[in-house]
Amino acid sequence: MIDSLSWQDLAQAKRDALKNSIPKNWRLEQVPSPEHLQNGVEFVESNLSPEERQITELPLEVLRPALQAGLVSSKEATLAFAHRAALAHQLTNCLTEFILEDALRRADELDIYLKETGRPVGPLHGVPVSLKDLFYLEGTDTTVGFAAWLNDKAMIQDEAGVVKILRNAGAVFFVKTNVPTSMMCAETVNNVFGFTNNAINRFCSAAGSSGGEGSLLALRGSPLGI
């Protein structure tokens, strides 16, 4: 069935799947246009709970030791940043994957490990980490903007080395971010996911090749982006 679909159909199906991966209670009923909302920062903040805002506004150098000490659980941090990332995506189109279920499973494992052993897994214990869509991550597409690479899990023989290193350090992968086609362009746009807007001025481009990461981080949708 997939082989008979056009690349346009495949791309639309991927975008629909991405949209549907965001929990319904995190989806905006209406996304404000750039004409009505140029800068997305305050809008994102206003749609968070006080607890979510407190966690997501912690700088990494404060969040990391808090996670290692159990002052903030990995599950709490993952949920807070995932909600913020979902809002950021709806304003800027910055994501390619939203893998909340896998992220929460990993966060629970890390919280249990810390509770049972009294020590963190590694220096990034429980830290939510976003990945640019060039790093192979098991269970996700890595298209680099090519529709032909959608659903081609067989292409990925092994996860990226940096993914393995970060996971061993305790990272929690929860989203992947948009890039230009082949990353050979200074404009984050491709035929699969489309155009990524600038988070601060939504009339403008997020540039590239890390435009998805740029907009996500500008809206504090991730504490650490690779």
Predicted ranges, named:
Residues 2-226:
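Gly/Ser-rich catalytic/binding loops embedded in alpha/beta enzyme cores
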